[in-house]
Amino acid sequence: MNDRVFEQTMNQNHQDGGARECVLEARGVTKTFVQGGFNVQVLDNAQVSVRRGEKLAIVGASGSGKSTLLHVLGGLDEPSAGQVSLLGKPFTQLAERERNELRNRALGFVYQFHHLLPEFTALDNVAMPLRIRRMSTEEARRHAREMLEQVGLGARAKHRPGELSGGERQRVAIARALVTKPACVLADEPTGNLDGSTADHVFHLMLELSRTLDTSFVIVTHDPDLAARCDRILRLRDGVLHEEPAVPV
């Protein structure tokens, strides 16, 4: 069974498994910026509900507001109106410290560019979120090593980012996002800087990790073939999210 057939089977099993708890939800989210003295509405009454273990793709034209949506979903930016809840807790009802603690505990982030610290090894880059939580160096490295094994890079733990390929660096970034065992990972064009075959491998890895770790993924991508491998697709057009029908791959 090839990767895509396997993914399609697992997606169908997931969809047939009934409703699961909602880990991330946006209700009536609107985001407006002021540009050149004019109000520009990027998000218009956006509604998003992400279930545990679900893979949700967000697609849309360049400049349509996909990254803005991820920032709002991740509590990195506040909506002009509406509400975002993480594990049932609305960000707007939390003090800044509580919001940061919840975000750091329950969310992981992956970007188009890996943002690894060049002076640290792959192992210590992955361990960094745990060290920020004041976990001991020894324990943090143990968890980081286990996660590197899961992304197939156990043998590269002592290498620095400059000694890794583009695909390997992105796999380290994925391991870093998952090492805290978040409920949901927000990924902004995670394969956009990779060649076709490497992008395909990295995307498959994310979907497989979502299944094995029961972690939700919200993935912004411009690639319709990759988006079709997720459980659901939402298209952002003129600030409004539209759900698209699943198309077998």
Swiss-Prot record:
<dbReference type="InterPro" id="IPR011924">
    <property type="entry name" value="LolD_lipo_ATP-bd"/>
</dbReference>
<dbReference type="GO" id="GO:0022857">
    <property type="term" value="F:transmembrane transporter activity"/>
</dbReference>
<protein>
    <recommendedName>
        <fullName>Lipoprotein-releasing system ATP-binding protein LolD</fullName>
        <ecNumber>7.6.2.-</ecNumber>
    </recommendedName>
</protein>
<comment type="subunit">
    <text>The complex is composed of two ATP-binding proteins (LolD) and two transmembrane proteins (LolC and LolE).</text>
</comment>
<dbReference type="InterPro" id="IPR017871">
    <property type="entry name" value="ABC_transporter-like_CS"/>
</dbReference>
<feature type="domain" description="ABC transporter">
    <location>
        <begin position="24"/>
        <end position="249"/>
    </location>
</feature>
<keyword id="KW-0547">Nucleotide-binding</keyword>
<dbReference type="GO" id="GO:0005524">
    <property type="term" value="F:ATP binding"/>
</dbReference>
<keyword id="KW-0813">Transport</keyword>
<comment type="similarity">
    <text>Belongs to the ABC transporter superfamily. Lipoprotein translocase (TC 3.A.1.125) family.</text>
</comment>
<dbReference type="InterPro" id="IPR027417">
    <property type="entry name" value="P-loop_NTPase"/>
</dbReference>
<keyword id="KW-1278">Translocase</keyword>
<dbReference type="InterPro" id="IPR003439">
    <property type="entry name" value="ABC_transporter-like_ATP-bd"/>
</dbReference>
<dbReference type="GO" id="GO:0005886">
    <property type="term" value="C:plasma membrane"/>
</dbReference>
<keyword id="KW-0997">Cell inner membrane</keyword>
<comment type="function">
    <text>Part of the ABC transporter complex LolCDE involved in the translocation of mature outer membrane-directed lipoproteins, from the inner membrane to the periplasmic chaperone, LolA. Responsible for the formation of the LolA-lipoprotein complex in an ATP-dependent manner.</text>
</comment>
<dbReference type="GO" id="GO:0016887">
    <property type="term" value="F:ATP hydrolysis activity"/>
</dbReference>
<keyword id="KW-0472">Membrane</keyword>
<dbReference type="GO" id="GO:0044874">
    <property type="term" value="P:lipoprotein localization to outer membrane"/>
</dbReference>
<dbReference type="InterPro" id="IPR003593">
    <property type="entry name" value="AAA+_ATPase"/>
</dbReference>
<keyword id="KW-1003">Cell membrane</keyword>
<dbReference type="Pfam" id="PF00005">
    <property type="entry name" value="ABC_tran"/>
</dbReference>
<keyword id="KW-0067">ATP-binding</keyword>
<dbReference type="GO" id="GO:0089705">
    <property type="term" value="P:protein localization to outer membrane"/>
</dbReference>
<dbReference type="InterPro" id="IPR017911">
    <property type="entry name" value="MacB-like_ATP-bd"/>
</dbReference>
<dbReference type="InterPro" id="IPR015854">
    <property type="entry name" value="ABC_transpr_LolD-like"/>
</dbReference>
<feature type="binding site">
    <location>
        <begin position="60"/>
        <end position="67"/>
    </location>
    <ligand>
        <name>ATP</name>
    </ligand>
</feature>
